[in-house]
């Protein structure tokens, strides 16, 4: 545009601003008292949420209307099931594709919400291994919530292993139950950071889908969890004689819960990445898919995972690999990160006891969080005049999730596109 004007996008008195220590304060109170405070703000250069000083305060007079938004927040049942903010129609709110005016956002759209990331690298590895085995990612109580809940269950005879695994995830809020047969289950609090993983693994056909990217994320700890969950070991020799020194045996791991393509990719991954001689076969009257390791591959695989096995699972190892377990819990302090969150409700408000419109200016980064939702700060500019051209852009994240083959020839790719 040739001309620059001024606009007065603002928030209501009652909108909670997230302060640097994680607490909140009413926007109107911050402005009226010109509070010298630091707020949380997103730094585009570092890609981190950081504390920033408020450098100016604005009361721009009475507003005729505010748009009150409710935004889904992971952790339903903790009293923080949604974020809440009220803005004028022209206030800028951050979305996954950039800044948008409040009036252009609809129910079902996504905005950027600061949410805690709780999982350490070690715990992420455990999640990946558990999903390949006895674990699952279930939807939260609110089906439209963009989070996922990790659930793990084991029979009564594996109670020690169950306790060991839960101890590695003990900092995540959870509840434990036991059924009539003595089987134990643990349900962890929904986490926003697991939503994308759940979307990638469960495609709606009842089988778990493991992409090439998923397999690249596996570590020896992930493989150990998978093996302890679904693997069996047949010890053929304890190695008491010289010709069988060190012992020998064979591993079989059930992969029936995975899609056929995932079974093949996993077999190829084990061969190409770890040099393991592994084949797929159908086992038993139910013809369930299992991965069968050769004797040499069994020893090589167990050498890889032995340091990450639970002590109570030593019976799944050759005798020479006993006593190598060295896993200890690795917890991290929660880190606030921007994550897309769904708008669940928008309501026009014209009857607040205080209808004045307020805003603040934030040092350097010029944004702050309204109850966790990223919004722009003042001062802002109006539309001006003499518009020459208008542009619209949509960002698409295209990922290859499967290579389709005809025999050994690659004929196509299966992709997922996220708008």
Curated annotation (Swiss-Prot):
InterPro entries: DNA_recomb/repair_RecA, DNA_recomb/repair_RecA_CS, Hint_dom_C, Hint_dom_N, Hint_dom_sf, Homing_endonucl, INTEIN, Intein_C. Its main location: cytoplasm. It comes from the Bacteria. It is found in: Cytoplasm. One of its GO terms (biological process) is DNA recombination. Pfam families: LAGLIDADG_2, RecA. One of its GO terms (cellular component) is cytosol. GO terms for molecular function: ATP binding; ATP-dependent activity, acting on DNA; endonuclease activity; single-stranded DNA binding. The keyword Cytoplasm applies. This protein undergoes a protein self splicing that involves a post-translational excision of the intervening region (intein) followed by peptide ligation. Keywords: ATP-binding, Autocatalytic cleavage, Cytoplasm, DNA damage, DNA recombination, DNA repair, DNA-binding, Nucleotide-binding, Protein splicing, SOS response. Belongs to the RecA family. Can catalyze the hydrolysis of ATP in the presence of single-stranded DNA, the ATP-dependent uptake of single-stranded DNA by duplex DNA, and the ATP-dependent hybridization of homologous single-stranded DNAs. It interacts with LexA causing its activation and leading to its autocatalytic cleavage. NCBIfam families: intein_Cterm (TIGR01443), intein_Nterm (TIGR01445). This is Protein RecA. It comes from Mycobacterium gastri.
């Amino acid at each position: 545009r040739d001309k620059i004007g001024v606009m007065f996008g603002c928030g209501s008195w009652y909108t909670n601003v997230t302060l640097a220590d994680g607490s909140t304060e009413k926007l109107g109170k911050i402005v009226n008292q010109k509070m010298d405070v630091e707020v949380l703000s997103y730094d585009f250069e570092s890609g981190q949420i950081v504390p920033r000083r408020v450098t100016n305060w604005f009361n721009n007079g009475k507003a005729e209307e505010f748009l009150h938004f409710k935004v889904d927040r992971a952790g339903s049942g903790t009293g923080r099931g949604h974020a809440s903010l009220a803005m004028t129609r022209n206030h800028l709110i951050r979305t996954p594709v950039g800044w948008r005016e409040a009036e252009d956002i609809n129910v079902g759209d996504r905005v950027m919400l600061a949410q805690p990331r709780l999982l350490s690298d070690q715990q992420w590895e455990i999640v990946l291994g558990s999903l390949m085995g006895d674990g699952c990612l279930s939807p939260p109580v609110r089906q439209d919530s963009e989070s996922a809940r990790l659930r793990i269950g084991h029979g009564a005879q594996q109670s020690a292993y169950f306790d060991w695994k839960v101890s590695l995830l003990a900092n995540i809020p959870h509840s434990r139950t036991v059924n009539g047969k003595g089987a134990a289950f643990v349900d962890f609090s929904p986490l926003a950071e697991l939503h994308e993983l759940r979307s990638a693994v469960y495609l709606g056909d009842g089988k778990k889908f493991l992409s090439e990217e998923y397999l690249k994320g596996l570590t020896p700890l992930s493989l150990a969890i998978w093996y302890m969950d679904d693997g069996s070991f047949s010890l053929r020799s304890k190695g008491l004689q010289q010709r069988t020194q060190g012992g020998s045996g064979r591993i079989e791991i059930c992969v029936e819960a995975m899609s056929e393509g995932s079974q093949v990719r996993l077999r190829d991954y084990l061969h190409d990445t770890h040099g393991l001689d592994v084949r797929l076969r159908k086992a038993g009257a139910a013809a369930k898919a299992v991965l069968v390791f050769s004797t040499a591959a069994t020893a090589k695989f167990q050498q890889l995972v032995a340091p990450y096995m639970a002590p109570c699972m030593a019976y799944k190892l050759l005798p020479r690999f006993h006593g190598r377990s060295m896993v200890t819990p690795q917890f991290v302090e929660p880190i606030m990160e921007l994550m897309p969150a769904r708008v669940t409700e928008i309501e026009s408000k014209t009857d607040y006891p205080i209808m004045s419109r307020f805003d603040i200016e934030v040092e350097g980064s010029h944004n702050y969080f309204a109850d966790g939702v990223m919004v722009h700060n003042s001062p802002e500019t109006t539309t001006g005049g003499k518009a020459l051209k208008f542009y619209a852009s949509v960002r698409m994240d295209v990922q290859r999730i499967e290579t389709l083959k005809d025999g050994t020839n690659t004929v196509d790719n299966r992709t997922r596109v996220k708008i």
